[in-house]
C-alpha cells in the first residue's frame, strides 16, 4: 500500500486504482521531492497533478506545504481512489478533482475567455 512520505499527512495510507496504474515507489517519490524541496518548489505552491492516478504526488505536495492542488485524471477508477484519499485526511481539503482528459482540462484553463495559468508546479507522471 502507498503512503505519504513526509509532512503533515506523513504515514497516511493511500488507496490506488486496482488496474491501469502503476504507483511510483516511495523511494522514487522521496528522491523527487528531495530535489523539489531543495529548490523551494513545494511550500506555498499551487500544484497541478495531471494523469493523477492515486493522487500520491499531489497529496505529497499538500502534506509538504503546497497551498492548493488540482488533480486531473480521466479514469473513473482513478477518480474513485482519489475521492477515497481525499476523504481520508483533512490535510487534503485544498485539493480539487477533475475527471476529464488532461488536454481538455488544460484547454479549458489556459485557452479561451478565462485563462488561469497560475500554477507553480505541474506534475506529469
Task: Please name every model-derived segment.
Residues 1-124:
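Class I S-adenosyl-L-methionine-dependent methyltransferase catalytic core
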